[in-house]
Amino acid sequence: MSENKQPEQNQDLTGEPSPEELEAAQAADEFDAMNAASEAQAQLAVLQAKNTELSDNYLRAKAEAENARRRAEDEISKARKFALESFAESLLPVLDSLEAGLNMKEATLEQLREGSQATLKQLKAALERNKVIEINPVAGSKFDPHQHQAISMVPAAQEANTVVAVLQKGYLIAERVLRPALVTVAAPQ
């Protein structure tokens, strides 16, 4: 028995694909396109979710920063208020002493002097507690333009640009000049 292969009846002898092959290829292309589209849609959904998450995180961080700024402003405001309150409270004993001195009807000059000295001592203590420090340069010390204000230059036997006399004490508060000391300075010779 001889087996002869006979060409299939549907086979195209021209070398071009048959309609069934074209249909199968087209179906495969459509399937690949559908897979690519569904993958793209899945990636898009993932990216949209990530975008939403990042947007939410940004808004939360922005709100948290705004809240932190408000809290800081409130704390600064309270610190100023309470610092002023503390300073005023430390001056109340001085006020009490001055009022008591003024209420004395038959005070002697010596009693007034002692009362004034005690009140001055109270005032200096209150200023020290609140970090107000006296600037009182000694004669002959170097002139410091950051803490001293020269009122005049006078001829003196000491080195030029040194303090000759203090006309009015200055004050620092927390290492910042509240008022410079008014001084006379030795003139160059």
From Swiss-Prot:
One of its GO terms (molecular function) is unfolded protein binding. GO terms for cellular component: cytosol. The keyword RNA-binding does not apply. One of its GO terms (biological process) is protein folding. It is found in: Cytoplasm. InterPro entries: GrpE, GrpE_coiled_coil, GrpE_head. It comes from the Bacteria. Keywords: Chaperone, Cytoplasm, Stress response. Disulfide bonds: none annotated. Residues 1-13 have a biased composition (Polar residues). Residues 1-35 are annotated as: Disordered. Belongs to the GrpE family. Participates actively in the response to hyperosmotic and heat shock by preventing the aggregation of stress-denatured proteins, in association with DnaK and GrpE. It is the nucleotide exchange factor for DnaK and may function as a thermosensor. Unfolded proteins bind initially to DnaJ; upon interaction with the DnaJ-bound protein, DnaK hydrolyzes its bound ATP, resulting in the formation of a stable complex. GrpE releases ADP from DnaK; ATP binding to DnaK triggers the release of the substrate protein, thus completing the reaction cycle. Homodimer. This is Protein GrpE.
